[in-house]
Amino acid sequence: MKKILLIIMLLFFANPCLAIKIGLLTDTDNVPFGTSVFGTITDANTNRTVVDIEAMQGYEIKPYNNVMAIKIKGKYYKINSDNIVIKPVSFGYVCTKSKWYRGFLRIQNKGGKLTVINDVDLEDYIKGVVPAEMPSGWELEAHKAQAVAARSYAVANLGKRAGLGFDLKDTPDDQAYGGASAETAKTNKAVEETQGIVLTHDMKVITAYYSASAGGQSLTASDVWGSNLPYLRSVPSFDDNIGKKGHGVGMSQHGANNLAKQGYNGYQILQYFYKDVTFAKLNPEYYK
């Protein structure tokens, strides 16, 4: 097998702690939620605690004029804020959309409709992306390639949805994200063993596009979007037995798994699908 020289650079960013904001819901009229442990609701505008939350209890937030109301044991109570944060007070999870999430929830009243955002550390976010984007039963090295590609996409696209108040959606419009409910021991291992690793080209983190399958030959960015991204070239995608699913640019997920079965490691898979890239490690200050 072809040997590769793995060069890891250290990227420095001004922000001392990298978190990401993921849009879970927009333009909704009610938000059921809960926490796995005791928690609080704070007014994000004043940082004042407005409600204490019991563990494993169901609650609901609705818009009320320009602020919000919370349903507690069948009764609604006004919360004089248009921007609240729901957070466990110790290690625990928050729940909405019938899923558990790490980090905390932010709910905003925007013109009488609610937006729900999961504020979460980057690595915890990637733990919820890998099993949502790639079957957990696939090869570990394919999961590692997926983790690095997903992390690169996320970092390169921070602020992409800033007009909506968050960075990325939780859907394949950006990256599928299932929160802590989607996590498995195997996919978490892939994330942890590649912690902080991203793909760069010309000292910039790349938007590492990927799709389910390319149907035998991947496409270039100019083929699909008319933009020239030199690290996205057309290569045999090792998924000939799978019909094309998705845009076909960058890494084929089925192809990545097939290469892993042939003995390629995660980094070799990435260097096959993304050309002239360097592996870089995010500043460890992010993880303090």
Model regions and ranges:
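Conserved, single-site charged/polar hotspot
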Residues: 5-288
